Amino acid sequence: MPPLPLEHRPRQQPGASVLVRYFMIPCNICLILLATSTLGFAVLLFLSNYKPGIHFTAAPSMPPDVCRGMLCGFGAVCEPSVEDPGRASCVCKKNVCPAMVAPVCGSDASTYSNECELQRAQCNQQRRIRLLRQGPCGSRDPCANVTCSFGSTCVPSADGQTASCLCPTTCFGAPDGTVCGSDGVDYPSECQLLRHACANQEHIFKKFDGPCDPCQGSMSDLNHICRVNPRTRHPEMLLRPENCPAQHTPICGDDGVTYENDCVMSRIGAARGLLLQKVRSGQCQTRDQCPETCQFNSVCLSRRGRPHCSCDRVTCDGAYRPVCAQDGHTYDNDCWRQQAECRQQQTIPPKHQGPCDQTPSPCRGAQCAFGATCTVKNGKAVCECQRVCSGGYDPVCGSDGVTYGSVCELESMACTLGREIRVARRGPCDRCGQCRFGSLCEVETGRCVCPSECVESAQPVCGSDGHTYASECELHVHACTHQISLYVASAGHCQTCGETVCTFGAVCSAGQCVCPRCEHPPPGPVCGSDGVTYLSACELREAACQQQVQIEEARAGPCEPAECGSGGSGSGEDNACEQELCRQHGGVWDEDSEDGPCVCDFSCQSVLKSPVCGSDGVTYSTECHLKKARCEARQELYVAAQGACRGPTLAPLLPMASPHCAQTPYGCCQDNVTAAQGVGLAGCPSTCHCNPHGSYSGTCDPVTGQCSCRPGVGGLRCDRCEPGFWNFRGIVTDGHSGCTPCSCDPRGAVRDDCEQMTGLCSCRPGVAGPKCGQCPDGQALGHLGCEADPTTPVTCVEMHCEFGASCVEEAGFAQCVCPTLTCPEANSTKVCGSDGVTYGNECQLKTIACRQRLDISIQSLGPCRESVAPGVSPTSASMTTPRHILSRTLASPHSSLPLSPSTTAHDWPTPLPTSPQTVVGTPRSTAATPSDVASLATAIFRESGSTNGSGDEELSGDEEASGGGSGGLEPPVGSVVVTHGPPIERASCYNSPLGCCSDGKTPSLDSEGSNCPATKAFQGVLELEGVEGQELFYTPEMADPKSELFGETARSIESTLDDLFRNSDVKKDFWSIRLRELGPGKLVRAIVDVHFDPTTAFQAPDVGQALLQQIQVSRPWALAVRRPLREHVRFLDFDWFPTFFTGAATGTTAAVATARATTVSRLSASSVTPRVYPSYTSRPVGRTTAPLTTRRPPTTTASIDRPRTPGPQRPPKSCDSQPCLHGGTCQDLDSGKGFSCSCTAGRAGTVCEKVQLPSVPAFKGHSFLAFPTLRAYHTLRLALEFRALETEGLLLYNGNARGKDFLALALLDGHVQFRFDTGSGPAVLTSLVPVEPGRWHRLELSRHWRQGTLSVDGEAPVVGESPSGTDGLNLDTKLYVGGLPEEQVATVLDRTSVGIGLKGCIRMLDINNQQLELSDWQRAVVQSSGVGECGDHPCSPNPCHGGALCQALEAGVFLCQCPPGRFGPTCADEKNPCQPNPCHGSAPCHVLSRGGAKCACPLGRSGSFCETVLENAGSRPFLADFNGFSYLELKGLHTFERDLGEKMALEMVFLARGPSGLLLYNGQKTDGKGDFVSLALHNRHLEFRYDLGKGAAIIRSKEPIALGTWVRVFLERNGRKGALQVGDGPRVLGESPKSRKVPHTMLNLKEPLYVGGAPDFSKLARGAAVASGFDGAIQLVSLRGHQLLTQEHVLRAVDVAPFAGHPCTQAVDNPCLNGGSCIPREATYECLCPGGFSGLHCEKGIVEKSVGDLETLAFDGRTYIEYLNAVTESELTNEIPAPETLDSRALFSEKALQSNHFELSLRTEATQGLVLWIGKVGERADYMALAIVDGHLQLSYDLGSQPVVLRSTVKVNTNRWLRVRAHREHREGSLQVGNEAPVTGSSPLGATQLDTDGALWLGGLQKLPVGQALPKAYGTGFVGCLRDVVVGHRQLHLLEDAVTKPELRPCPTL
């Protein structure tokens, strides 16, 4: 019989392997070899399997896997068809959800009874439904009607039903930032303000951000006056009038006051916030002054020669110093009170300082019981309980027998329940006794209960009873409920071996269970759960099999804990380790206990005897005794088995090892031990990420990714409790077998779930108790809650059930029971309740209404379409309905396709081709005006706002979680929209037939999306291998958007990408995503459109990079993209993307069925104008893509009653379908092949689909706009915003055709110039702010008679005036903006020196507070020429000359890349500004991209041309000042540290003036590649980057740094791991990418180190992402304590100047006296004094001792003297020390020191010797020492991380007296010998304090500490003399203060 042919479908034919393809060569030899080898292999196979007498048949061919390539999303699974095995479909699992009422609100605005029902609905509807929040969707914000005051804030309860006013208990994690309180006091943060208000019960609120008086810190400035701008509240530093030049040229101001000169007048006016103007030169005359004395603080004002008293001159600053006046009004400061006096013309005397509103708090005198706190809620005193407890887990047993996580939780529960609960004892309670077999203690009842909820997981296990269980959780639930000892025998189904089941890893061999051997175990010890260390995990499993006990891998590495106290970290308590070990083993740490600090308080006498076998093989009488033994021995001990221990029955060893995981079908996991469950490491621990506490193992289901959870634990990774369970923490801390059931009483609880941390249930009003089962005295809990009648009815006749409950008689009693949650499939559709809330189905509505005791009925089937007041039903009535409300989706009886609504009153549905045509009509209606339609549409959608989320990060910013409702679906024809109050909540736009717009929130009103907002769209192309854990294979069916496969695949891809984008770096502007097309690629090519906020600054590379980062960190099976990722994830920057085809209204319900109306015109290639991508679109977009169609519903009105008569056929025309939208007029083209639309005002586009945004005029140098003549005879105020592409051009001009008068604004040499002439000569005012090409600038000017002011970008006004003579400005020409007509050029050039117009844009022009409508300039101008439209893209049009390439930068700035021979910002200059070189000497000249040249000054020179020689600063430190173009070139970091490639510790102190710039950079190459390390500022955030060869690690500071202040930053790298710390803030950790082949842990550097900038940023590594230099000052660059900013390390300095803004670098007034050295310490300093001087400023002289005095001691190398650190014995003799002798830095026995300070004088000839030592003797620990090594003095200290050695440059073995000063502050150290510059350094990141034994040694030590790697010199005693020893700024008496006093002798004289 011939073999049957194999049948395969073409698209399922498996691809040929590479081997077969290789052999398919048309070669006879190859064919012969192949046939021979195949025949030989077949013969061998036959012989090896042949047995005589046994016949076999060939195995039938396996049918093809029909589910391969079938993508099922949202929890559905693929199942083959029963009728047709060759077909398959996606079906939802028939899971039964728990009958639990825990309502949740989904992102589809529907309420579900619990989370399981939500997930079922997600699968059934095949759309993403997220958990929006706990509680029903219709619930209002509980804080909406609550007003909290006196410092408290509103906090909703966990169930969202109630709200409380609580005071903040801590401000940890709250945003910092000074705020001004309403009491006029500054607070560090708003949280601190609220805490203060709560604590003092004062009505204080935040008045302003920032300090109340921003000038508070500037009062000591003698050269400036600080004034707070009342508008911006920013301090303005104004020059004092006293510092004006002493010239006597009196002038008269317009306030009638004579001033010394013009400078004095302008400065006095500025200080008062006024613009004082000169009336005349000389003294004021009588006519210039007011005739009467001005009263009530009014000021004299002279206008047009008429002086009068005015209140306009009473101007006040913005400082907030509240004053309460007698009129009961609070004024911001006293000036405002004076202004009020002036305006009211009456006296308003002050009453007191501070605000008037000092209403006493209602909480004054109130007493709250049970630890509650009184807060003010809605104006009344209310006692509230504190709910939030911070801190670790420290369990206590309460007097109620309940275990609480801490004392705080106990007190909070006592307050909540209103009862007194005391701490009975430390540690957990044991109320239930011993709960066995995994049961948990229910403390309220004292019962042991079994958690029974198990998450479905396809991981069966074999139990020790020989039965197979669906999961390990099911096994433990069975063991608990049946109270039997049961454990997992093996994974998988049970397979018997003879009559037994092999357990603990044993395998069946020859009918006997044997244990496999470990022949080649992987290296690495592991710690078993029995406390034994095994050499490998394999040996652990072998031991478990041999001993037949359960042994799990507790952790990697040995079990022996680290010895406590072995090596100091430099900080922390010594007993921290012992405390942790004690706590881990069940003990309580008590320092006062007599039996030892670790107390094992176990009372086991009352526990019933129940023997257990311990893991140590010892039998204990109870489990309590085992725990006590575990605590006392402090060893790992657990119950190995129930009952007494028996001798282990050792299973025989298997002679050969079991098959390795490499021999399994899918190979090994990454641990090389666990067998993978599928391709791509599916089911492996590395991909599952199972929670180690909530799951049984690290493996998971290879298809769904579901881990094997413990009972009551849920989540994909088993990381949370299931609804209805709580206390996940108990699994971790108390070893619970799973989560604890909530056990809420259904009669008293409104929900079946509870709070996760406390287990409290949500009770009905009047019901109390943690489980809602308690009532007040005299009441009993019934079906209606707490009832006064305690009798319980017996029959249902006596019962009356409400809210849908039904009566049930059982156990002799009658009770009301709410309906079940289970509905038949026929009734599983959504329903709209009478409360306006959409519910999952009818049963869920009834159950939720019953449990919450609400009367809710079914309003309609399907989701709610408009707000319905509770209990009110819409009634029918005839009315005049707007047209668009009547346009409904009318479906044909024979058609299942819903149609797009028309824009007229009649709809003609499009029938299927096989269906008869059906005409459906609607009643006539009155058409609404466009304004009516717009207002109604606004009213419809205004409630589609966002709602509060659940707090989940994955929901943050989610489009569906935003609560956007559709709300715009029309009511049935003839119905009335009932509006009883505001709507509660609306359905999501995804419930509307036309779906959502591209913003993902707005429902589309029509298929064209006419109401949709604009979006910014990017197009991406992705090569996909799989999505949601399922492989993707391209089939032709995917190309059809109408196919089911396309729809399912599109929904899965869109949902996954939506998740990724919403957690990415671009999530703030991301709106939605839509799959455009699926095509063939390497696997499947997906083209997507990503829609963003139209104002976003993100570009296509940002979108692509954000998606790549999310793909790399997300779950591997979520979205599988072909590798390498960067080559298969691409987003396009430039492409033509027609707006009209960017989406259709295709919601999920409309899916593919909705026909999209498009034009039938053929757009020729010539008529299409390509434009820059990304495109802007206002089209609706849904979750799936609808097909393009050329059919459109007719829009002409037809008679309903008149039948249609066939007429002559004519060729269809393009305009028949009326394609022009929004009232546009359609005109057919003569060719008959297209049409054109004439759009109405405000519309544009091919079919008028675009909203024409207001245009900004653009000028090209010869363009201009002409407006009517300015009216500016005596006064003019003008504001203008412009963007220039060139540095020269006319902005504005108005002149006089016959006279000299004119007014002009122009750009000249890159600055704004304001000129005007009143007839007696021009005034020229030039701004000091440079104009940057491509950036928007704002200028403001004013003119009053001959005086004028000009300010650009908020600069201090530039003031000027025209020559005296005529004052008025006579203008008669047109006002020209942006340029001039040709006939005016010559005149204007002569007057302004500018003869060309502006090249750029002007977007705002305000004249005398009247804004000209430049956006509609076509209607406003008198004349125009050559004016275009200004684009948002700075390079459109191209501003660069000579064909230069334009590059767009941030904030609308561009950069022209000039070709050779062209220069300037737009490459318009042909002259090189550096030829000839204008710089002094050898300073190099650099051409700037913005135009001009820059001299790079070397060290010692400064100035624009390096012409200034800097004076020698002497001993002053050098602080480098950078201007954004300067830099320092130093030796590379690798030259300072030998092991820099492995690790690095660097510290930097800087002050930034600009938000961005490079701080330091060191690289390997100069081609933009290679390793590098960099630190840079990006928008005020620090970024520490380094690349070790595989990609850059980016570590970014969490908070932005403050500009203008000194900042200290610490950088650390060890291998691939790095850390960044700013100041004392938290450390931010990061890691560079990992490679599988090469470790990439070394940093290879070869180039110099650049600080503050670089000579050429294009040569830096691209991964550093820097393009600008640093603007600011750098004080310190320290590498492991070694200062790098010194002359010896600097190779080149370019334009670096000394920073003069620090006290240590001021030209005068050196703060350190008597030759002391000033050491910068960020913003402060420290003085290092020379010999003979001391004090903070070296102001104190040290009195020299006599030669023979014992205060000068001699040391002979064996003289070792001990002192108490930082204390003198003379002080110890005082019982009560004198206050003036106390010092807070010096304690009697300082053992943990944050700082050290030593000064001494020494004389010696020795080259070696230990001078001073602080530290423990005899062990390795922290120390600090002064020693002489090779004739130089060394300061060394070790705080626990790594020693630091500072070496002096001065030799001390000269037999001369030298003064030595050593200082340490935290990790910073300094050493100074004589007059040398101090040597400074720093220890690595880590400890900051020195832990010692409190002793200080002089002269040496008898024995050095063991283990310290110290030079030999430290072991040699000091030989020489010491005197004048100062310890901690205190003189040390060498004789009196000595603890050990060997034979001492004075130092001999020379």
Swiss-Prot record:
Disrupted-gene phenotype: Z(-)/z(-) mice lacking the 'z' insert are stillborn or die immediately after birth. They did not inflate their lungs and were never seen to move spontaneously. An intramuscular nerve is formed and axons leave the nerve and branch but do not stop and arborize. AChR clusters were fewer in number, about 30% smaller in size and lower in density. Transgenic null (Tg/Agrn -/-) mice, exhibit atrophied muscle due to denervation and are smaller than normal littermates. There is impairment of locomotory behavior and half the mice die after 50 days.
Chief location bin: other
Protein topology in the membrane: Single-pass type II membrane protein
Phosphoserine found at: 569, 571
Compositional bias per record (Polar residues), positions renumbered to this chain: 915-929
Region named Disordered: 892-971, 1174-1217
Ranges of residues in domain Kazal-like: 86-139, 159-214, 232-286, 303-358, 379-431, 442-496, 502-561, 594-647, 812-866
Feature: compositional bias, Acidic residues: 951-961
Laminin EGF-like domain segment(s): 688-741, 742-788
Alternative splice site to produce 'y' isoforms (site feature) positions: 1633
Domain of life: Eukaryota
Miscellaneous note of the record: Mice that have excessive neurotrypsin-mediated agrin cleavage, exhibit pathological symptoms characteristic of precocious sarcopenia, with fragmentation and disassembly of the neuromuscular junction (NMJ).
Protein name: Agrin
Species whose genome carries this gene: Mus musculus
Phylogenetic lineage: Eukaryota, Metazoa, Chordata, Craniata, Vertebrata
Gene name per UniProt: Agrn
